[in-house]
Amino acid sequence: MTGTTLAATYGPISGADLEAELAQPRIADGDAQDAAVYERDGGAHAPPDGDRADVRRAAGAGDASVRLTRVSKRYGERAVLADVDLSIGRGSFVSIVGRSGCGKSTLLRLVAELETPSAGTLVKRGDGGGALDTRIMYQEARLLPWKTVLQNVMLGLGRRAKDDARAVLDEVGLLARANDWPAQLSGGQRQRVALARALVHRPQLLLLDEPLGALDALTRIEMHALIERLWREHRFTALLVTHDVQEAVALADRVLLIEAGRIAFDQRVPLDRPRARASAAFAALEDRVLQRVLTGSDAAPAAPNAAGPEGASRGRAAPASGLRWAV
């Protein structure tokens, strides 16, 4: 059976990934070739096995730091990002919003080092200036369908990591499904497994590329609470790309808007956690960000104490409850 045939059967895993998996030599421990498939897509430059334990220990002692200086990205003649300057504080949660094609996911891929800048510099520093373990979650869970839930979480770690994998499955509420197949899970449960697979490595930086975009509204809210709880417990740095402005405000300390390849808006979110979505302060801040995305101007009233002096009202905006998506 070819990788193309398997891709048609199993969907989210691309044909190229499966071809790579099938081309690997079969050895006693099948985790090695499966891990190669995972590391290329979701491992985002994971360290070699021998270094992984040291990185996990460092992650427990410090947080991630990312700095971009005049970073640009071009594909041929088309400029996607232009002169981006961005500093992401250690342990912070940053959301990126913007219209389709503005460069959000390209920026995330640059931070993941899945692509390289055309110009400028990108620096990632772990604790004490050491290596920075980075993991990435996509909209598709990208689970290997021939592996159980537990085996998917253990990819790249070997059988000695079973206790760690079971512990993180317990954290995401899926320990009872450890021996099930991915096909037996709902979409939200598959994303929980993908989250567990990232967190078992104890990353210092977690990149989220619209991971909840395909889920229903109630499941999204449950996942928001889970991601926030785990972020607060593990204190990794999080960078989220999303089309959903409400999601961005609910999760982040800071919301960035990308327009025409540049950071056009940088909004702090000083609301208490957990966020009360029905509160006037939350609604006003969400509305301000959304109006900035839609109109290109800061027309909405700011939440009290949320935006500083620049948040003064300059016009009447549509209710935030009626508009959420920046597409």
Swiss-Prot record:
Q: Could you tell me which Pfam families the record lists for this protein? A: ABC_tran
Name the EC number(s). 7.6.2.14
Which terms does the record give in the GO molecular function aspect? ATP binding; ATP hydrolysis activity
Q: Which Gene3D superfamilies match?
A: P-loop containing nucleotide triphosphate hydrolases
Q: Does the keyword Transmembrane helix apply?
A: no
GO CC annotations, alphabetized: plasma membrane
Residues given in the record as ATP binding sites: 98-105
Q: Where is this region: Disordered?
A: 21-54, 300-327
Q: Which InterPro entries match?
A: AAA+_ATPase (IPR003593), ABC_transporter-like_ATP-bd (IPR003439), ABC_transporter-like_CS (IPR017871), ABC_transporter_ATP-bind (IPR050166), P-loop_NTPase (IPR027417)
Query: Superkingdom of this entry's organism?
Result: Bacteria
Q: Where is the composition biased (Basic and acidic residues)?
A: 37-54
The answer to whether UniProt assigns keyword Oxidoreductase to this entry is: no
Task: Report the subcellular localization.
Answer: Cell inner membrane
Q: Which UniProt keywords apply?
A: ATP-binding, Cell inner membrane, Cell membrane, Membrane, Nucleotide-binding, Translocase, Transport
Q: Which PROSITE patterns match?
A: ABC_TRANSPORTER_1 (PS00211), ABC_TRANSPORTER_2 (PS50893), SSUB (PS51291)
Function per UniProt: Part of the ABC transporter complex SsuABC involved in aliphatic sulfonates import. Responsible for energy coupling to the transport system.
Q: How does it assemble?
A: The complex is composed of two ATP-binding proteins (SsuB), two transmembrane proteins (SsuC) and a solute-binding protein (SsuA).
**What family does the entry list?**
Belongs to the ABC transporter superfamily. Aliphatic sulfonates importer (TC 3.A.1.17.2) family.
According to UniProt, the name of this protein is Aliphatic sulfonates import ATP-binding protein SsuB
Q: Give the source species.
A: Burkholderia pseudomallei (strain K96243)
